[in-house]
A protein has these predicted regions:
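Active-site substrate-recognition segment that forms the wall
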Residues: 52-57, 116-122, 237-241, 246-384
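Glycine-rich FAD pyrophosphate-binding loop
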Residues: 55-77
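C-terminal lid/capping helical subdomain adjacent to the catalytic/cofactor pocket in oxidative enzymes
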Residues: 32-36, 49, 210, 380-408
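Dinucleotide-binding Rossmann-like beta1-alpha1 core, especially the glycine-rich loop
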Residues: 81-166, 175
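N-terminal Rossmann-like FAD-binding beta1-loop-alpha1 element of flavoenzymes
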Residues: 36-63
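Flavin (FAD/FMN) cofactor-binding and adjacent substrate-gating region
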Residues: 131-210, 215-225
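Conserved beta-strand-loop-beta-strand element in the redox core of flavoprotein oxidoreductases
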Residues: 215-236, 242
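Short hydrophobic core segments
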Residues: 39-41, 65, 229, 237-249, ...
Length: 408
């Protein structure tokens, strides 16, 4: 499995409340009312987004549980930059159609919603590769014949001209790709997440954060359904509808029958000198699906975030019953081979930064599905349980839209 993007979306799981637009499963579960008790497990991107959009639609009894306050230390959304683009991940016609709907609505949210608009940066996005195999995979992500906004790049000097002179000094060996001049860029993930949580609270959502009071230890399985959750302090949280949005930790609460695999990616920050920051400001997102990607420096610290491209890491642990699963853990370090990949990317693009020390490093966990499509639906057996998981490294774009609408 190859991660090819990070996107960000905030409407996600509430599309499953009142309409059937994205239904893949129907049931006879009773409809909720505006005053029904709604419980969300997880206050990361999708959990917080779901809470916000439920509150915006008038639901008055919404509670969110998480072992950390927003932004959670282990949330993939607790990050500076996430790519915003409408790129595809499949050749399947039905999946393409759904992705286009989600991407269009999410992008409209980033561009027009007053809550999210301040955090979106329309810098443009380069999508590229440097081998025949990579170019074939790039052909799934980018369809230049369908988008006049794309400019084809084939020569090193074309890549270097994407930024002011002195920024992209590399040789770009073998690189070929397409540059989206507008309608793509990045969002400040952490700030958008915090803003969404604050707005949800203002609208009446109750956030219960910290350990033990916010750490869910089990769902309440009762009468062949899910009726809420139990936290580490022993408190029972009963609900008419439970939303499971626990990110990479979601498999610890439910058997997903090998549909999900928590996978870790690696990222670093490189600090610029104060006098360098203006030169690098507003550069487009530079993404090679075989090498990695990086962004313009953040305004607060003047640091460039860089991610290397690789199949991802797992942490396989065997439980007492013999079950083996990948268990996420927090770590502000990356493996040595990941550092080598980051520095190789910099040598090809910005060699002047290739030997600088990292000011920050982290592994970032996502719940991956086999085809990188989201798993958002009512559970086929537990009809009061709504799943919002399988973000697959690209669910962050959905912060700005209401994906669970219709699933409750």
């Amino acid at each position: 499995m190859n991660r090819t993007s990070h996107s960000f979306d905030f409407h996600s799981v509430t599309d499953f409340l009142n309409n059937n637009r994205f239904h893949t499963h129907q049931s006879n579960v009773m409809a909720v009312t505006k005053s029904s008790s709604l419980l969300i497990v997880g206050a990361g991107t999708w959990g917080t987004s779901t809470a916000l959009h439920l509150a915006r639609r008038g639901y008055t009894n919404v509670t969110v549980l998480d072992p950390y306050p927003v932004p959670s230390a282990i949330s993939a959304g607790n990050d500076v930059n996430k790519i915003i683009s409408s790129g595809q991940y499949t050749n399947n016609k039905d999946e393409i159609e759904i992705n286009e709907i989600l991407a269009e609505e999410a992008f409209n949210g980033w561009k027009n919603d007053p809550l999210f608009k301040p955090y979106y940066h329309d810098t443009g996005l380069l999508m590229s590769a440097c081998s025949q195999e990579g170019l074939e995979r790039l052909g799934v992500r980018v369809r230049p014949g369908e988008d006049p906004n794309l400019v084809e790049l084939t020569r090193p000097e074309q890549f270097r001209k994407l930024a002011p002179e002195g920024v992209l000094q590399g040789d770009f060996p073998g690189w070929k790709g397409y540059f989206a001049r507008s309608g793509a860029g990045w969002a400040h993930a952490r700030n958008a997440l915090v803003a969404a949580a604050r707005e949800a609270q203002r609208l009446g959502v109750k956030f219960v954060a910290g350990t033990p009071q916010g750490r869910v230890v089990t769902l309440i399985f009762e009468n062949n359904d899910v009726k809420g959750a139990v936290t580490a302090d022993g408190k029972i949280w009963r609900a008419e509808r439970t939303f499971l949005c626990a990110g990479a930790s979601v498999s610890q609460f439910l058997d997903f029958m090998n549909q999900l695999r928590p996978t870790a990616w690696t990222l670093v920050h490189v600090a610029l000198k104060p006098e360098e920051r203006a030169l690098y400001k507003n550069i487009p997102v530079i993404f090679n699906i075989e090498r990695g990607f990086f962004f313009e420096p953040d305004e607060e610290r003047g640091e460039i975030k860089i991610c290397d491209e690789h199949p991802g890491y797992t942490n396989m642990v065997q439980s007492a019953d013999g079950t083996v699963m990948s268990i996420p853990f927090e770590k502000t370090q990356i493996p040595k081979e990941a550092e080598a990949r980051v520095r190789a990317l910099l040598k090809e693009t910005m060699p002047q930064l290739a030997d600088r020390p990292f000011s920050f490093a982290r592994i970032c966990w996502c719940a991956d599905t086999a085809n990188r499509e989201f798993l958002i639906d009512r559970h086929p057996q537990y009809h009061s349980l709504v799943l919002g998981c399988g973000a697959s490294g690209r669910g962050k774009t959905l912060t700005s839209r209401d994906v669970t609408r219709g699933k409750s």
